[in-house]
Amino acid sequence: MVFFTLFLLFVFPFLQAGPLDNWVSFLKEAAVETKELYYPQISAQAGSYTFEEGVELEIYSSKSSYYDWAKIRFTSQFRPKLSLKKKDPATIQLGYDGTLEDVFTGFVSGNYDGGTYANEVALKDEMLLMEETIINDTFLDTTPQELISYFLAQAGLSKMKLSSKTYPTRKMLPIRRQTAVQAINAVNAAWGLRVPFFFSGGVFYWDEKPEQKKVYTFERGVNILNLRRAGGVWELETVSAPFIKHSHKINLIHPQVSGEVEVSKVVSKTNDSGFIRTYIYF
């Protein structure tokens, strides 16, 4: 695992005017090299539409939630007429200097009539397909992994990473007219398990975490815009950080918190000045 430090260039004469976000950050691999990152960029796609300006974004991802969600909001100067169908594919990317990373993949969560102006488009990740897939069967001599693989296949999904732990075979498990999400909860209950499951990057995880190749460091006065504790959790505010995912580890250097922590939630959204801010919870 490689450790990285994300540096902000704090140029105080520019801070109030906003160009801080055009000088945004440095990405430094310890004792190896520093990569300068300028000019934050966005790209939001819903169905056949692509938006790179005139929109505000909000992306929510939490390991305590079954699904990630996002919203593409249109500014007062930009009210397009959209024609979108529920389950049209959707992607939101954030990044710098032409290098963008997916922060959301999923689908449009409802229908949008082309005859009306839209204020926003709501999106849900692949769990939307699981919510609309009904399981109605009795399963014999099976394991949790076999059942979950079947549920995913019924929803038309094949990318998954399931726990490699060995569980005893259950002789019979009836599931009657439950969504695939409810069916997974029934499987967990039948085996007495309390394990997380979610999608990340289009891959379904059950009692597993997405691979992490880099650990990023956040430091007071360098790349932490604000750090506060509320509701029993810490909230760290920084600039657009598309490379931070929930269940990943980050390293903190701050008088209040120091050391490595696991991210429980990530929210990226447009602030009142029109810039993307990422809020990391742990």
Give residue spans per PLM region.
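Classical Sec-dependent N-terminal signal peptides that target proteins to the secretory pathway
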Residues: 1-17
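Juxtamembrane "anchor/assembly" segments of surface/extracellular structural proteins
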Residues: 14-83, 126-128, 210-282
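Surface-exposed cap/loop segments at beta↔alpha junctions
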Residues: 75-156
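Extracytoplasmic/secreted envelope proteins and their assembly/folding machinery
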Residues: 105, 145-152, 181-185, 244-248
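Short beta-strand-centered interaction patches in the first periplasmic/extracellular domains
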Residues: 118-128, 161-230
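Soluble non-cytosolic domains of exported or imported proteins
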Residues: 138-146, 174-182, 241
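LysM (lysin motif) carbohydrate-binding repeats in extracellular/periplasmic proteins that recognize
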Residues: 158, 194, 257
